[in-house]
Design a protein with these regions (language model features):
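Intrinsic, short, N-terminal disordered tails of RNA polymerase sigma-factor systems
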Residues: 1-240
Length: 240
């Protein structure tokens, strides 16, 4: 991917939006933050802290409710850590003090409502439960998994809305869930396309995927500098 065209200059980080001061914008921005971070937080509580599913679900919801009400995440200082690390550390502190906090949780109010697919997260988690991975590495892996899943969902909506169903099928067959032996040639034969068409169709979907993934990443970082580092690490691109 070349140049800066994939990095919308108008998209502010979720932290900038939360700090903006407008109550409606803060609530909307916090909802975006929850969408990006709830799954890594939930899985971290399940795997690192060994919380049972139901307790981890309650703790995840309560953590974000408390963070919203107490403005914990607004205290982030970018020179000390990456924002995702700060979120994880805040979750750790919350769990350590969860017994004292439980009486103050789930007050509702203006906390943004986000649908959390705990069952889906649990299915993704199952193979991980036999060992306890290094916390930061595991949290990062799940952050990336959630980021990519959101980008794929947006791509599906975009391509289905424009009738590019074959593009999606190729993307799913080659990139999302490839079978042994799959190749551009086998897909071309199966779908009645040329190899060049398969190449071009996949390029379109991948370009859209990276655009949406990078846009989402920009929103979930704590600063422009952090975003540039994360984009370089994940996609090998320079956003300068």
């Amino acid at each position: 991917m070349e140049g800066g065209g994939f990095f919308p200059a108008t998209r502010h980080s979720v932290l900038e939006r939360i700090r903006a001061g407008n109550a409606d914008e803060r609530r909307h921005a916090f909802g975006d933050l929850i969408e990006g971070y709830w799954s890594p937080v939930y899985k971290h509580l399940r795997v690192t802290w060994r919380l049972p599913p139901e307790e981890a679900q309650d703790a995840t919801q309560s953590f974000f409710a408390e963070a919203y009400e107490k403005a914990w995440l607004e205290r982030f200082e970018p020179e000390k850590a990456r924002f995702r690390t700060f979120v994880r550390v805040c979750a750790d502190r919350f769990v350590m003090n969860r017994h004292q906090a439980e009486t103050r949780l789930k007050r509702g109010g203006a906390v943004p409502q986000v649908s959390l697919d705990f069952a889906g997260a649990e299915r993704e988690l199952s193979p991980e439960l036999t060992t306890r991975p290094e916390a930061e590495t595991f949290f990062y892996q799940e952050f990336v998994r959630a980021l990519f899943a959101r980008a794929v969902a947006v791509v599906r909506t975009e391509f289905e809305a424009t009738g590019r169903h074959v593009h999606l099928q190729l993307f799913e067959r080659y990139d999302i869930d490839p079978e042994d032996g799959v190749s551009y040639s086998t897909l071309a034969a199966e779908f009645g396309l040329t190899v060049t068409q398969v190449t071009n169709y996949l390029a379109q979907v991948r370009r859209s995927f990276r655009t949406h993934a990078i846009e989402s990443l920009r929103g979930l970082c704590g600063s422009d500098q952090e975003f540039r580092r994360e984009a370089q690490d994940l996609f090998g691109v320079d956003t300068e």
